[in-house]
């Protein structure tokens, strides 16, 4: 006998909402109330950060695709902590020589949590444009003394 649980209302609401955004030279698939590790940001813990470079937003049945970015869209993030990634070993060696070099690198990361994904539908401002008439100019007469 199998039992299936229905998702709670809060998870079902956020289940259909996601955004693909560009930050730190990479593209991330952001969902609300999830943690992400991105390259180190100059922000303190508990600071709020806004990302405006949104490539795609999906909300239920609506998909907004940017060219290259979606206008009036933003993602609100909260900095949770700063940390360092696992060490990456770089080993260089020349065969048949006694040349070996072992180095390592740890990437500095910032852990962020997505607070909200939003798109605002602002109507473009209508302004009355006045037509500017060009004055017809006649070519200047050349100076015969030259």
Curated annotation (Swiss-Prot):
Lineage: superkingdom: Bacteria
Chain residue ranges for the region called Disordered: 96-146
UniProt keyword annotations, A-Z: Ribonucleoprotein, Ribosomal protein, RNA-binding, rRNA-binding
One MF term in the entry's GO annotations: rRNA binding
GO (cellular component) term, any one: ribosome
GO biological process: translation
Keyword rRNA-binding among UniProt keywords: yes
Xref: InterPro entries: bL21-like (IPR028909), bL21-like_sf (IPR036164), Ribosomal_bL21 (IPR001787), Ribosomal_bL21_CS (IPR018258)
Keyword Ribonucleoprotein listed: yes
NCBIfam families named among the record's database cross-references: L21
Family affiliation: Belongs to the bacterial ribosomal protein bL21 family.
Free-text function comment from the UniProt entry: This protein binds to 23S rRNA in the presence of protein L20.
Quaternary structure, from the entry: Part of the 50S ribosomal subunit. Contacts protein L20.
Protein name, entry field: Large ribosomal subunit protein bL21
Source organism of the structure: Prochlorococcus marinus subsp. pastoris (strain CCMP1986 / NIES-2087 / MED4)
Gene name in the database record: rplU
């Amino acid at each position: 006998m199998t039992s299936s649980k229905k998702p709670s209302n809060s998870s079902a609401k956020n289940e259909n909402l996601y955004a693909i955004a560009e930050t730190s030279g990479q593209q991330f698939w952001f969902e609300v109330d999830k943690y992400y590790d991105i390259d180190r940001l100059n922000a303190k813990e508990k600071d709020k950060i806004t990302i405006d470079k949104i490539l795609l937003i999906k909300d239920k049945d609506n998909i907004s695709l940017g060219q290259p970015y979606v206008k009036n869209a933003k993602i609100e993030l909260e900095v949770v902590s700063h940390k360092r990634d696992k060490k990456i070993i770089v080993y260089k060696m020349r065969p048949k020589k006694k040349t070996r070099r072992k180095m390592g690198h740890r990437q500095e990361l910032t852990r962020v949590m997505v607070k909200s994904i939003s798109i605002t539908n602002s109507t473009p401002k209508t302004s009355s444009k006045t037509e500017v008439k060009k004055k017809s100019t006649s070519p200047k007469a050349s100076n015969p003394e030259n």
